[in-house]
């Protein structure tokens, strides 16, 4: 069975390890753990990992965040992956840093990357892993906040956050979305 795991982020070194790129960070960490590297292909950097007999196709769109749907749609069709086997990893300002929430469907919550995916796929019925990045910013400073690096304190906690996110990704593919949601949504 194949799964499409999309980590949202922006390409370019200036965005490396910023809050908005936490989706990329999860996939980078998973690829490193599995000893694979990403290759630049159409609309994305792609890597493939095997987990308990399942194939996870890791996708880091090169279309910039607000056009992520283009890469998702292309790789979904290219690999012939059903909507229920897609997981999108994204940052979430509404959740405290380190909090993870997995949902089988839902709204974009104002997230432009998710909005474009929903618009392109004509559906919001795909699983998403929302990763809390906090909301410690002044009114009107949201863009600067998500494009800024994590604080020193947050960086200390990042290995644990990434481990829990990787566990959520592999759980999605191996134990199913319902059980993965139970495991993810009951932990901090």
Curated annotation (Swiss-Prot):
Site entry (Stabilizes the basic form of H active site to accept a proton), positions: 91
EC numbers for this chain: 3.1.1.29
Pfam families given in the database record: Pept_tRNA_hydro
Keywords assigned: Cytoplasm, Hydrolase, RNA-binding, tRNA-binding
Reaction(s) this enzyme catalyzes, per UniProt: an N-acyl-L-alpha-aminoacyl-tRNA + H2O = an N-acyl-L-amino acid + a tRNA + H(+)
Active site: 20
Keyword Signal: no
Site (Discriminates between blocked and unblocked aminoacyl-tRNA): 10
Top-level class of the enzyme under EC nomenclature: hydrolase
An annotated GO BP: rescue of stalled ribosome
Compartments where found: Cytoplasm
Cysteine disulfide links: none
PROSITE patterns listed in its UniProt record: PEPT_TRNA_HYDROL_1
GO cellular component: cytoplasm
Residues reported in the UniProt entry to bind tRNA: 15, 64, 66, 112
The keyword Metal-binding appears for this protein: no
GO MF annotation, one: tRNA binding
Record's function text: Hydrolyzes ribosome-free peptidyl-tRNAs (with 1 or more amino acids incorporated), which drop off the ribosome during protein synthesis, or as a result of ribosome stalling. Catalyzes the release of premature peptidyl moieties from peptidyl-tRNA molecules trapped in stalled 50S ribosomal subunits, and thus maintains levels of free tRNAs and 50S ribosomes.
Entry protein name: Peptidyl-tRNA hydrolase
Name of encoding gene: pth
